[in-house]
Curated annotation (Swiss-Prot):
This is Large ribosomal subunit protein uL3. The keyword Ribosomal protein applies. Keywords: Ribonucleoprotein, Ribosomal protein, RNA-binding, rRNA-binding. Belongs to the universal ribosomal protein uL3 family. One of its GO terms (molecular function) is rRNA binding. GO terms for biological process: translation. NCBIfam families: L3_bact (TIGR03625). One of its GO terms (cellular component) is cytosolic large ribosomal subunit.
């Protein structure tokens, strides 16, 4: 199955009515025209993919290699660059624009983004653990529980206080409610990872029903 994909920026959430009168919560994703910066082939790169870029970046903030890479596509340096695999390479050439019209209402997509960062958090906030008694002489409230007395080491993956969020996550099998080509907007049913104004990747779902 060939994949279609586009890069965008999360605007926020709202709700719209469908033709049947159902009120649906949607995430608004702004998808300005993406530029194909590179077409990767098995002969040159060992795998097939296209490299897309979106959101112009000032040249003074860009190093020389990135400027030259963008110049090959006759465009300006881009702030957000990602690769899309399993595409039909014959449909793309360097410098082409990819717009919102590659998707239509009803399409199933996977959306990848960076989740909100919450900083250093304890077990109760980070992992949903239960707190201890807050009264009657208890001196155990919000601390991690005992790890046992025998093992003499901490297992990998042990749930302990630490940095929460700011991970790459993918929401699978979301439905596109509307694809507005004139305004460069996709309305996606439900929520997608990341804060408002963060970049996301929208691709054809790998588990579409």
């Amino acid at each position: 199955m060939t994949t279609k994909g586009i890069l965008g920026k999360k605007v926020g959430m709202t709700q719209v009515f469908t033709e049947s009168g159902e009120l649906v919560p949607v995430t608004v994703v702004e998808v300005q025209p993406n530029v194909v910066l590179q077409v990767k082939t098995v002969e040159n790169d060992g795998y097939e993919a296209i490299q897309l870029g979106v959101d112009d970046k000032r040249e003074v903030l860009t190093n020389k290699p990135a400027q030259g890479h963008a110049a090959k596509a006759k465009t300006t340096p881009k702030r957000f660059i990602r690769e899309i695999r399993n595409v039909e390479l014959g449909d793309y050439t360097v410098g082409d624009e990819v717009k919102a019209d590659i998707f239509a209402a009803g399409d199933a997509v996977d959306v990848t983004g960076i989740t909100k960062g919450h900083g250093y958090q304890g077990n109760i906030h980070k992992d949903g653990q239960s707190r201890g008694p807050m009264a009657h002489g208890s001196r155990y409230h919000r601390r991690p529980g005992s790890m046992g007395a025998i093992i003499n080491r901490v297992f990998k993956g042990k749930k302990l206080p630490g940095r929460m969020g700011n991970h790459q996550r993918t929401m699978q099998n979301l439905q596109i409610v509307r694809a507005d080509v004139e305004n460069n907007v996709l309305l996606i049913k439900g929520n997608v990872p990341g804060a408002n104004k963060s970049f996301v990747t929208v691709k054809t779902s790998v588990k579409s029903k």
